[in-house]
Amino acid sequence: MKLIEPRNLKGFRDYLPKDQIPRSIIFSKIKGVFERFGFEPLETPVLEYADILAGKYGVEGEKLMYRFKDNGERDVAMRYDLTVPLARVAAQYQNELPKPFKRYQIAPVWRAENTQKGRYREFYQCDVDVVGSAVGIADAECVAMVEEIFFELGIKKFVIKINNRKILNAIMLTAGVSEEKILDAIRAVDKLEKVGPKEVASELKEKAGLNSKQAEQLITLASTKISDINALKTFVEENILKQPQAEQGFEELNSVFVALKAFGVKNALIDLSLARGLDYYTSTIFETIITETEDSKKYGSVAGGGRYDQLIKLFTGKDIPAVGISIGIDRLFAAMQDLGLIQNKGIVSVLILNLEESLQKEYLKMLSALRKAGINAELFYSLADIKKQFAFAESKSIPYGVLLGLDEAKKQAVTLRNLETRKQKTIKQKSLLKELQKLLK
């Protein structure tokens, strides 16, 4: 018989317990903050009709979609993000959902992109969105929530960059970009931090039809450092006020920052070069970068999103405002590993060692009592060398071991061992539960 080589597709991976346990802890903390902010869970299918997803992500995003014909010759695609499926849900169930509708979803998405550290073709997103609320508090709440999540995960240094697509559009028009080329110019500017001004200028000339002077002006305007909302007002008045969207963009961003100040958010700043490459953004956009690492570009954006007031209209024919933000858990996890924030923690608290054949019933009774008391416990299934059983406990990061041999059984006692410090003490069997509950608080 020819053996099948066990292997993964490029960009896809397994999560063994040593990785999945801390990931689950991170998911749980994120979910806790989501629910604290009033967001409710939603699940959507992996597969959607291709026309639901197509045309929402721009030319480059379209190339990354996993799209194929299923067994019924239907044109289908695997979800590229969680936002467009939400837009479909908001339209499909618009008469059943509360208004505004605040939802979160934690699920994998698929993109056929180049792989690198922290970037995969299958990866999880943690999304929150508010459907049915105009620009202002809802946008600020998304930002405040991300800040709280990062603090809760132990990340101290990060920035949440914020911009407004209307202001960015006004910059584009001021520099000479035509209306029909704005999205092409936005996709170019979106790469400014990754590839630098020279490459962006080249793409602006090639894709957006600008000459060298116009490209330079656009990059200069978009690279202007804005210290606060008052500085933004001055920038708008001095540079782009002639464009019809400029004033509205400023007023929208101002309303967001008024709410952010009330929320007490400290890590948000205005970045006029922030573009976000997806086509459906219409107003506020955000992006979060971890700055604790030596190279803040290493993982790219670990959280990003924005307002998409016209996306749901594609399904309903009417404007329904919406805003959301997504956390890329794989990039976040990779960064947290480098920062030493991932604890090697198991889910089992106690291992009962298997030392005597004649004591099997006692082991099982003890195991059952611990579990019924809410303690995660397991028994080493077979008789084995004690060193082997300790090694098993260490491999699973189990903190405590319970030893019951013939001598302890005669005295109705057990030995409770701290498997990390190797300190142990003998206690009465009836005291074991109370002792463990005290240690595991």
What residue ranges belong to the model's regions?
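Auxiliary tRNA-acceptor-end handling modules of aminoacyl-tRNA synthetases
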Residues: 1-20, 178
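Positively charged, Gly/Ser-enriched RNA/tRNA-binding surfaces
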Residues: 22-37, 48-49, 72, 83-94, ...
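Polyanion/phosphate-binding surface patch
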Residues: 42, 46-76
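Acidic, His- and aromatic-enriched active-site or binding-groove loops in soluble protein domains
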Residues: 63-72, 177-198
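Short, conserved phosphate-binding/catalytic loop or strand-edge motifs used
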Residues: 120-126, 162-170
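Hydrophobic mid-domain F-helix/FG-region of cytochrome P450s
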Residues: 145-152, 166-174
